[in-house]
Amino acid sequence: LKLIRKGAEADLYLHEWHGLQAIIKRRVRKKYRHRSLDLRIRRYRTVHEAQMIHEARKAGVPTPIVYEVDKDHFTIVMEYIPGMRVKELLESMDGEERRNLSHRIGGLIARLHKRNIIHGDLTTSNLIMAEPTRRNPEAGGEGMLFLIDFGLSYFSMELEDRGVDLHLLKRALNSSHFRVAGECYSHVISGYSEAIGEEYASKVLGKVEEIERRGRYALRSTP
């Protein structure tokens, strides 16, 4: 196993699985939790994440294929997607490429939300532009855009939760891509609105504004 990333909740390994390049995601023990509680939580989250990845694929969102789930060892074996994280690509693109990519991201989020799936951790680190060998017919022959890391995802019919998803992405853009954040977010919303419908999108965006107002108020109220 080759460790490629250590995370707060899980470690990622690159591994050959039955002749295929695969990612193994292994949830790590939290020593501050009681052992029996920790086991239950890790088992549940392992199975839940695999289920949510499957549900996202059913919704038409490209995600890694899940090959195997081992709840007793808290691992998911899934497809390795050769490519680059959008975080590493976004600012090196020309304006048209960046606008197009942002529009596509909005469309993917809309597909999730139409199926009542909330990602819970929308950042440019959790989007992978696959290498050109993986073509997306819907995007004019461009590489496929994959959404990963469904560890915090859940089902919800609430507008508020959709607003939180978009707010998290907006915050991630401002944090990691300040120079192009406004432009990118605008085109994310364009793609989202086109895919989910203008009327519904405006309700979700109203929630985003509410969330931002609450955040500003909380900051002002802090002594």
Cite the ranges covered by each PLM segment.
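ATP-binding glycine-rich loop module of kinase domains
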Residues: 2-47
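Active-site beta-strand termini and strand-to-loop segments that position acidic
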Residues: 15-18, 79-80, 131
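Conserved structural core of kinase catalytic domains
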Residues: 43-45, 57, 61-105
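C-lobe/activation-segment region of protein kinase-like
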Residues: 141-223
